[in-house]
UniProtKB/Swiss-Prot annotation:
Keywords from the UniProt entry: Membrane, Transmembrane, Transmembrane helix
Highest rank taxon of the organism: Eukaryota
Membrane topology: Multi-pass membrane protein
Residue spans crossing the bilayer: 35-55, 66-86
Note: Partially overlaps KNS1.
Subcellular localization: Membrane
This protein's name: Putative uncharacterized protein YLL020C
Organism ancestry: Eukaryota, Fungi, Dikarya, Ascomycota, Saccharomycotina
Cellular component GO terms, alphabetical: membrane
Length: 101
């Protein structure tokens, strides 16, 4: 019976907490690990911005190379915050699969 209740959450975009299905609106706050990850991403982002300003034009690392890597690193926090904002059911289902096993 308990496993059936767990499986009923599958594909609904809700996650399981203490054996109950909770929708994203019922989950209050973010886990501490998520907050530390967000804090780390924001810190790394601003360190990159500072490096971009500080790097002189005649240094070994050209600005075009740096901007190329910098623009790709911007995608990491973008997708991270996107998943937090919209609570994609795909990611909840992945964690649900681990929970059932």
């Amino acid at each position: 019976m308990n496993s059936i209740r767990k499986l009923s959450c599958f594909g609904t975009g809700s996650s399981i907490y203490s054996g109950k299905c909770l929708s994203s609106t019922q989950q209050k706050g973010l886990p501490q690990r998520t907050l530390w990850t967000m804090n780390g991403l924001i810190w790394a982002y601003w360190m990159m911005v500072l490096q971009l300003i500080i790097i002189p034009k005649d240094s070994g690392c050209s600005r075009s190379t740096f901007l190329f890597f910098f623009s790709h690193l911007l995608l990491v926090p973008f997708f991270f915050f996107l998943t937090l904002l919209f609570h994609f059911p795909v990611f909840n289902n992945i964690s649900l699969n681990f929970y059932i096993q």
